Amino acid sequence: MTPVTGTALADDHRHEPIGNPRQEMITMLDPDVRRALDGTSIAHLASVLPDGAPHCVPVWVGTHGDHVVIFTGPGTRKARNLRRDPRVALSLTPADNPFQPVVVRGRVIGWLEGDAAWTIVDRLATKYTGQPYPRGDERVVAVIEPERQRVGVG
């Protein structure tokens, strides 16, 4: 899949239906969802294994425009899962309000690599640890377009 750039994502307001055409596409992150994603709570990312079983792992998460971003190594199980089947679910519980969990479902619409990826990787690492991410291993960023989002138990 061709990497997408931050500029292209921020400037592209075209959205085509994915899946059920009657399902309303979400083009903007809810402000409460954005606030939670931009906080320091660890998210849990669910993807689909080759046999159809769920795969859930903790991840650092953030926003990039109206998209959700996570990073990983290009050969990790989650990267392989998401490249094969782009459907994803994320959940997190904000530490300051554990009774308002956040759930986002969507699809990976692109991958950032190289300098574009490292800009986001460093931003997330600094948010969570106060320091840029150590160099050495390659990192890629999955860009997720939210299709459904929810705040609170329901």
Summary of predicted features, one role per range:
Residues R34-R35, W60, R80, P132-P134:
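Short secondary-structure boundary/capping segments
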Residues L29-D32, C56-V57, G75-R77, T129-G130:
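A generic local structural motif
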Residues P31-V33, H67, A117:
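Catalytic cores of transferase enzymes with a strong primary signal for eukaryotic protein kinases
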Residues T2-M28, N97-G154:
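Charged, gly/pro-rich active-site loop segments
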Residues H15-L49:
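Short, conserved active-site entrance elements at the starts or edges of catalytic domains
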Residues G39-T40, R84-D85, E147:
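Structured helix-beta-strand junction loops
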Residues A36-L37, L82, L124, I144:
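A generic structural signal for nonpolar/aromatic side chains embedded in well-ordered alpha-helices
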Residues T40-P74, R80, L90-L92, V103:
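Short beta-strand segments
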